[in-house]
C-alpha cells in the first residue's frame, strides 16, 4: 500500500461564522455550495489537504494552505484507484448569496438551493452546475464541453446581457456548464 492511500481521510467542520459572500481558490477539490440549517464549511479529504478558511467582512475565504497548489495525482496510480479528491461543502441558511468567486483547477463545482446574483467561476477540469441563478446577465464559456441553460443546449458558449451590473461569469476549460434561472 502506498503512503497516499494509507493517509487518514478526515471529516471536519472548519468554520461556522456568518457570511453572505464566498471566495474559493483551490487547486484540487470538489466544491459544493448549498442551503443548510447553519453557516458552516465542511471538509472531507486527506488531513494534509485541509484548506485555510476565514471570514472577513462577511466574506468566506477558502484557499489552499500557504498558497501551496497540490496536484491530486500519483504517477503510479493513473486510474485513480487510490486517490481521494477533497470535498468542500459550504452551507448557509439564507437562500441568497451576494457574490460568489470560485477558482479551482481540478474538481466539480455545484451550487444548489442558493440564489446566486453575481459572481465568477473559473474551472479547468470538471463540470459546473448552478441551479438557481438570479443574475441579470450571463457570460458562460467552455472550451471542451457544453453549456446548458434551463435544459437547453447552447453549444460551447452563452451570453445574455453580459454588461449588466450583476453578471454570472463562468469559464471552464474541460467540462460542462449547467445553469438554471427564472425569467
Where are these regions (language model features)?
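Flexible glycine-/small-residue-rich
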Residues: 26, 64, 94, 104, ...
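Structural motif
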Residues: 27, 54-58, 105, 124, ...
